[in-house]
Amino acid sequence: MIVLPNKVRIFINDRMKKDIYLGISNFGFENDIDEILGIAHLLEHLLISFDSTNFLANASTSRSYMSFWCKSINSATESDAIRTLVSWFFSNGKLKDNFSLSSIRFHIKELENEYYFRNEVFHCMDILTFLSGGDLYNGGRIDMIDNLNIVRDMLVNRMQRISGSNIVIFVKRLGPGTLDFFKQTFGSLPACPEIIPSSIPVSTNGKIVMTPSPFYTVMVKINPTLDNILGILYLYETYHLIDYETIGNQLYLTVSFIDETEYESFLRGEAILQISQCQSINMNYSDDYMMNIYLNFPWLSHDLYDYITRINDDSKSILISLTNEIYASIINRDIIVIYPNFSKAMCNTRDTQQHPIVVLDATNDGLIKKPYRSIPLMKRLTSNEIFIRYGDASLMDMITLSLSKQDISLKRNAEGIRVKHSFSADDIQAIMESDSFLKYSRSKPAAMYQYIFLSFFASGNSIDDILANRDSTLEFSKRTKSKILFGRNTRYDVTAKSSFVCGIVRGKSLDKTSLVEMMWDLKKKGLIYSMEFTNLLSKNTFYLFTFTIYTDEVYDYLNTNKLFSAKCLVVSTKGDVENFSSLKKDVVIRV
């Protein structure tokens, strides 16, 4: 670890795929409480800008921090990627503090699309922020557009809070020129922020929250000490369904269960977690997980690898102390309990955006202060991989699981998805067969539309057959050579329970790079949040899908795009009753 005079921390990580990865601690949307919710997320969208033909890049805003990364591709170099990312924050050697109203307006529209996307596919319910005075969704809404001048002032104010002590930088390689460049830019920031934000309200403990969830989860408040952080690292590397959450200076260990009986035993204090010592902890974490640790605990004064001897040699005492603290929090009700609930009728409170939720007090009734049993945890395997065809009945369940677990990766091709994970076969089956997970998986049917129409365009099946078997989406045609013939009509209007545009496009020079560039152009115009595309077996032919509230504008953009020599697009209007009758005539596509 290299520490600049203003406390910027720089790490060399030659194993990461990114060229540069930058995080800003104490800079997430928890800072929006008592301001306009969404300022942090809007700032993220305003800052990131790059040439998608030369770079891959992304950014994210979490509760307590913001992070950005960039990777060079094609003819660009690592140095180009570093300079591109730094340019998001600095202009002519000075920290950016000016944002045009037109750009702010476009990105607010994009935020509204992201809200729509996330609520169609996920259950975006941030319990901790809600209990601390925020909302269940804190990513920004379209009504921000009514206060553009105030929003712009808040964005400038937020930029002035950035200080050297907030900055963490990972680089793949660090030469003298790069280090000097960092000193001239991020190294020029003040060691402490020019504007000190107000303290974040303390969240309320001793609450039971009934909300959609794939698991029965208990958030246990523990002290944010070094030993407890090492204990969390130990548990995370060894077991599934254990993680942590932070808000302000508070730390919660999250423990999830698939068995309701075990969950209730843990809550009543009659059972403790069965934590076994493993042979060794390697700290072989992803760069995302490492960055999160440094940002959530900015007071860590050493490289995490400096603690590898301590976490292994002192694991017994660390885990005993952590186990005792967990149990004390259970007894004292320093917990937030999440109980899976999928009823739309049950509600006893709402956030300012009128999202309904049930919040109850966690009482001491039935507490047993002498545990007499232990609960086994799901152990991690080194690595596992499976391939699921689009016709497999478990397809949507696996997609749902990957969306609820950050350490599961999906890679899609024309025939199915390849899934990398670290579960045993028995554990993954137990999760997918659990009652709460099955209800969660079925509670957001919008994600299914992407695969319904992918199956329609890539197979010879009719829309009626596909809809009749939507739980398995039907297996694709196994013919390796299929010729897609486009009809005269380029637009088919349907009614579904989600608003989206999808279809197949073909072009002589069409490739993934051009489609990514197209996606970013649509994002800059505020018309979409993201666009998925799948390369079909026919040459230069892709399937596109995007959730959007601006369906006509997106259709017009795609319909007039000169890269497409042929196209067939479906435009869905949101409604209570599905109507796909326009696709029943044999005029759309023949395989």
Curated annotation (Swiss-Prot):
A Pfam family this chain is assigned to: Peptidase_M44
Enzyme class: hydrolase
A Gene Ontology molecular function term of the record: metalloendopeptidase activity
The EC number(s) this enzyme carries: 3.4.24.-
Cellular component GO terms, alphabetical: virion component
Entry annotated with the keyword Signal: no
Chief location bin: virion
Transmembrane segments: none
Taxonomic superkingdom: Viruses
Posttranslational modification: Undergoes proteolytic processing during the course of infection. May be cleaved into 46 kDa and 22 kDa products (Potential).
Biological process according to GO: proteolysis; viral life cycle
The UniProt record lists the keyword Hydrolase: yes
Residues noted as binding Zn(2+) in the record, renumbered to the chain: 41, 45, 112
InterPro entries documented for this protein: Metalloenz_LuxS/M16, Peptidase_M44
Location of the protein in the cell: Virion
Family: Belongs to the peptidase M44 family.
Function: Probably involved in maturation of some viral proteins by processing them preferentially at Ala-Gly-|-Ser/Thr/Lys motifs. Does not seem to be responsible for the cleavage of major core proteins.
Name of the protein: Metalloendopeptidase OPG085
Species of origin: Vaccinia virus (strain Copenhagen)
